[in-house]
Amino acid sequence: AKGISVNVTLIFSLERYEQVIDAYIEGIAQAAANGHDLKHIGSVASFFVSRVDTAVDKLLEANGSDEAKALEGKAAVANARLAYELFEKKFAEDPRWADLAAKGAKVQRPLWASTGTKNAAYSDCKYVDELVAKHIVNTMPEKTLNALADHGNGAPSIEGTYEESHAIINKLAELGINLKDVTDKLEADGVAAFIKSWDSVLSDVQSGIDRVNA
C-alpha cells in the first residue's frame, strides 16, 4: 500500500498462501489509490518445499505400509504444485486484478525456497526440475545450482500435474497424515527460529553499541 516491495516468507500451506495473495492484491489496490507507480512495486511469496518432504517422509516411514512407501518424496512437490495452481487461479479470477495489471501491477511471483535435496535417495535437482513454470523464482543453494547446471532439465514441469497432486494429498489423508497439521508445525517452528536469529542479531548490535559507548 506504501509502494514498498515485499518478500513474504515462511509459507508452507495453501491456506496461508491464499491469505498472502489476497493481502498482496489488496495492498496493490491501496497503492494504486494512493497514487504509487505500480510498475515499480514487486513482490515474491516464498513457499518452502523440501522441509515438507522431510517431515512427511518421517510419518510415512513410521506407517511402514506399501502405500506409505509409494508416497515418500511426493508430498512437497505436490504441495508446491497446488500452490502454483492457486497462484494461477487467484490472479486470473480476482475481479480487481485485470484493472490493476492494466495500470502496471505485476503478479506476486511464487518463490520456491528450501529447494536443496536433503534425502540422498532423491535427485539433487528434484525440487528444481519438478517445479518449473512461468513466473517462478527458485532460491537454490550453490550445490543445487551446480547440479542443475551439470545435469538438470529445467523444462516446464507443473502444467498438467494438478489432478495427480490433489490425489497425492488425498492419499496422505487416507493414511492419517493431515498435511495442514504438518505445515502448521513447520511454520511455527520456522517463525520461532527466525525470531531467535533476529534476537541474536539485535543482541550483537547492542553489544557493539555498548562497547563503543564504554
Predicted regions and their residues:
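Catalytic alpha/beta core domains of metabolic enzymes, predominantly
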Residues: 4-143
